[in-house]
């Protein structure tokens, strides 16, 4: 469970995240590992890709790059983007999933009366900040998070986590980066369904991986429809 309101971080594990999603109330999506961002490796990923979840090491180069991007997004209209602020340390994995679910609800319905269904109904008209505060009080999500979180040998290790989850989604023909530490979403570029994965891969390569050449603690997951469900 949480220690001093600090959660134990999730792992970038497709099977674990799928089981976590099912218990939360979204069984129509699944996750597959992305092993690299050259076209040959991306060609192996089943289409259509709905989103990309990305885990990366936090460092000054990336923070500086992202701060620059943020300034370019101040005039964007984000009324059509579901967003939540992160206030709980190490909750970024769950925040990324909430961003995923919130922006794909029109295509992949949540299980009725599930934990997610109840949460989204409650926070639907709230600001991103109030949604983040509401998550702090949601014991159902917290308990499920810790049912599927990573294992740590020393509980004090959860204080020193320096990796972070974000998610990339396509909304109205644009690639949107959703990061709960930021004040608003980040718009990167125009794309389309066929090119979304490849365009997102280039963003990740240029704006994240190239900034951390000495630290290879990266992990990426493609989000695709579960074989048992059709897209609405």
Curated annotation (Swiss-Prot):
Q: Where is this region: Interaction with ubiquitin?
A: 10-14, 163-165
What is this enzyme's EC?
3.4.19.12
Site feature: Interaction with ubiquitin: 33, 157, 219
Q: Give a yes or no for keyword Iron in this entry.
A: no
Q: Name one Pfam family in it.
A: Peptidase_C12
Residues the record marks as site: Transition state stabilizer = 86
Region span, Crossover loop which restricts access of large ubiquitin adducts to the active site: 151-159
- Provide a GO CC annotation, any one: cytoplasm
Q: What is this protein called?
A: Ubiquitin carboxyl-terminal hydrolase UCHL3
Q: Which organism is it from?
A: Plasmodium falciparum (isolate 3D7)
